[in-house]
């Protein structure tokens, strides 16, 4: 007959169950365990042959060590393998429900008290004395997988992972469990009991592990660190799940369809698509859901809870998906890119709606070009691109617009309204997209990267325009002369060469400009402002295009390549001038003598031979020059350089 050990008859609790016991219940547990130990120790000793008092002293020391070891393990350790049949303690009840903790090691029969076990033991012919296991010894080995256990109770429960035995069945829903602790925790999903309450925020939890993980949100503790990428986690399950992103492991396979999953929770939810099980039922409206996250999100419809708060603007959301979508308004992130036209979108529904235009599967189809729309308002706005209708007219200047949003933005140019303010520098903007793009000048964020050359952009429109450098696409064509342009701004400026329109007038000197950027640059000649500073050498520029061209002197970047000979240039104007050496085009013609030039700068210098203008004057001797190059050469006469 196998020996009977103290661990075989001890009543064990999980760490969660032990935490629920009150001080009086813990004291009762210690007293019962000590009495059990005395009774068990008396089986294998001949009291008549030894000094009784010595034995009592020895037994007292040993039982104290054993009971303290059990209690310490419950108070301090991370419980792993010791899970056995236990009472279901409630925090406010002082009763202690007894189970049958005394099991015969020969035949497995259970008894309520030790004396009954003693009487039963005599029915077996062989009898061995009590044997004390050394601390840490694991004498129970699983024949299936070789795993070893210190306690018979843990070993029996482990065997169920192989046999599939689930002796604990829920009366409410019929679900069965291998472990009593799992069964007790499951019962709480029906009763709604949440015994673990956070003292910081009052939130309550069904599971102790979830409660511990939640507490780390307040403390900021993240004890689990990934060796691969250094990412830290507050919860061990999150850490284990993360490790699988590196290993690619998907240990949970569906027996129905063969699909494998990285996470057990995802696997469980997937299984319900086959079984139709929906264990999470709303008490308010009776709706049942298969997924706990969907259930929690649904509950918020009734409670109005909005736990996801935006740090930028304070707006709160009930659902994490809505919150993530909102965050993109601030960051400008548009993860859904159309491969057809390059347009990017914040949300998947917006992207899908846009794709209908290309596929032609929408209910509202344009008869002119075949583009389709799922929204009637979008369809109406699109039709105006063909009809030329512009129903929204500005009362201030008479300018008309096909779209109400464009009209509202235009009105702000007259009212001066700038409702969108940068929190970093206080600069205000009339348009929300403009403030998002501006904020990136502070953060340095450039989310749009060119796959051709690796260049990154803070603004999606700049990115799309840049792509046309590689593709050569020029979608904007002038109806007057047939000239095509890559950029709408260039096209609009070109149109003004035909109309002669110069809407931007300088208040200082009255000079007018056809282009807003030229106007802003001109204003800086009066103010002396040079807002663009090179981080490499500190040189400052009044124009953003000038600093970009200058930066290329440091980086060596030459993005503009001649298609004829392959020569590359840092500046777009340089490549255009160079291309004229191949084509022979000389667009700048002198009205005085009919001489033509390929370069505007050469043309301006030539004009000075007729006008006599010499804008470069030497401060040393007063001599003047019509060309900056001649002026610099002259200066060396004085400097001796």
Swiss-Prot record:
Gene3D superfamilies listed in its UniProt record: 6.10.140.140, Classic Zinc Finger
InterPro entries reported in the protein's UniProt record: KRAB, KRAB_dom_sf, Znf_C2H2_sf, Znf_C2H2_type
Protein's name in the database: Zinc finger protein 709
Domain of life of the native organism: Eukaryota
Any single GO CC term annotated in Swiss-Prot or TrEMBL for this entry: nucleus
SUPFAM superfamilies in UniProt: beta-beta-alpha zinc fingers, KRAB domain (Kruppel-associated box)
Renumbered zinc finger spans (C2H2-type): 102-124, 140-162, 168-190, 196-218, 224-246, 252-274, 280-302, 308-330, 336-358, 364-386, 392-414, 420-442, 448-470, 476-498, 504-526, 532-554, 560-582, 588-610, 616-638
Residue ranges occupied by any KRAB domain in the UniProt entry: 4-75
An MF annotation (GO) of this entry: RNA polymerase II transcription regulatory region sequence-specific DNA binding
Major subcellular site: nucleus
Family statement: Belongs to the krueppel C2H2-type zinc-finger protein family.
UniProt keyword terms in alphabetical order: DNA-binding, Metal-binding, Nucleus, Repeat, Transcription, Transcription regulation, Zinc, Zinc-finger
Job of this protein: May be involved in transcriptional regulation.
Subcellular location: Nucleus
Gene name linked to the record: ZNF709
Annotated GO biological process: regulation of transcription by RNA polymerase II
């Amino acid at each position: 007959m196998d020996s009977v050990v103290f661990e075989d008859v001890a009543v064990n609790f999980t760490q969660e169950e032990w935490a629920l016991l009150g001080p009086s219940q813990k004291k009762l547990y210690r007293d019962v365990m000590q009495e059990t130990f005395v009774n068990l120790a008396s089986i294998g000793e001949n009291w008549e042959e030894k000094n009784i008092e010595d034995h009592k002293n020895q037994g007292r020391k040993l039982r104290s060590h054993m009971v303290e070891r059990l209690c310490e393990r419950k108070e301090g350790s991370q419980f792993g393998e010791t899970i056995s049949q236990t009472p279901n303690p409630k925090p406010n009840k002082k009763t202690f429900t007894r189970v049958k903790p005394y099991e015969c090691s020969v035949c497995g029969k259970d008894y309520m008290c030790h004396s009954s076990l003693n009487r039963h033991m005599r029915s077996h012919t062989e009898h061995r004395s009590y044997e004390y296991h050394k601390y840490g010894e694991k004498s129970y080995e699983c024949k299936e997988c070789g795993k070893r256990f210190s306690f018979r109770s843990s070993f029996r429960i482990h065997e169920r992972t192989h046999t599939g035995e689930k002796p604990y069945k829920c009366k409410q829903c019929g679900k069965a469990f291998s472990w009593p602790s799992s069964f007790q925790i499951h019962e709480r999903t029906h009763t709604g009991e949440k015994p673990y309450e956070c003292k910081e925020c009052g939130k309550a939890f069904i599971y102790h592990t979830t409660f511990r993980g939640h507490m780390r949100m307040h403390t900021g503790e993240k004890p689990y660190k990934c060796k691969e990428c250094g990412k830290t986690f507050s919860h061990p399950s999150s850490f284990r799940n993360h490790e699988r992103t590196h290993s690619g492991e998907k240990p949970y396979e569906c027996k129905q369809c063969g699909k494998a999953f990285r996470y057990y929770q995802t696997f469980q939810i997937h299984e319900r698509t086959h079984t139709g099980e929906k264990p999470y039922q709303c008490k308010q409206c009776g709706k049942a859901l298969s997924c706990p996250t969907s259930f929690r999100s649904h509950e918020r419809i009734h409670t109005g809870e909005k736990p996801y708060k935006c740090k930028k603007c304070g707006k709160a959301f009930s659902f994490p998906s809505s919150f993530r979508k909102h965050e993109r308004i601030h960051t400008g992130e548009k993860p859904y890119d159309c491969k057809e036209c390059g347009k990017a979108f914040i949300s998947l529904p917006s992207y899908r709606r846009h794709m209908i235009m290309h596929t032609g599967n929408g209910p509202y189809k344009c008869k002119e070009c075949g583009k389709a729309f799922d929204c009637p308002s979008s369809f109406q706005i699109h039709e105006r691109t063909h009809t030329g209708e512009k129903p929204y007219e500005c009362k201030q200047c008479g300018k008309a617009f096909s779209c109400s949003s464009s009209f509202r933005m235009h009105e702000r140019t007259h009212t001066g309204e700038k409702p969108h303010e940068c929190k970093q520098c206080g600069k205000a903007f009339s348009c929300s997209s403009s403030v998002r793009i501006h904020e990136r000048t502070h953060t340095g964020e450039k989310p749009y990267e060119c796959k051709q050359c690796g260049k990154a952009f803070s603004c999606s429109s700049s990115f799309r325009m840049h792509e046309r450098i590689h593709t050569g696409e020029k979608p904007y064509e002038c109806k007057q002369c047939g000239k095509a342009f890559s950029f709408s701004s260039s096209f609009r400026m070109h149109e003004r060469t035909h109309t002669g329109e110069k809407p931007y007038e300088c208040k200082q000197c009255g000079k007018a400009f056809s282009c807003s950027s030229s106007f802003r640059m001109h204003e800086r000649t009066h103010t002396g402002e040079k807002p663009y500073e090179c981080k490499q050498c500190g040189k400052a520029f009044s124009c953003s295009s000038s600093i970009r061209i200058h930066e290329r002197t440091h980086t060596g970047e030459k993005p503009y390549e001649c298609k004829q000979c392959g020569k590359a240039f840092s500046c777009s104007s340089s490549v255009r001038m160079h291309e004229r050496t191949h084509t022979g085009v000389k667009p700048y013609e002198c009205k005085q003598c009919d001489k033509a030039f390929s370069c505007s700068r050469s043309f301006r210098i030539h004009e000075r031979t007729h006008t006599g203008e010499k804008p470069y004057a030497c401060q040393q001797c007063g001599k003047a020059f019509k060309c900056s190059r001649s002026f610099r050469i002259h200066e060396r006469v004085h400097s001796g350089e």
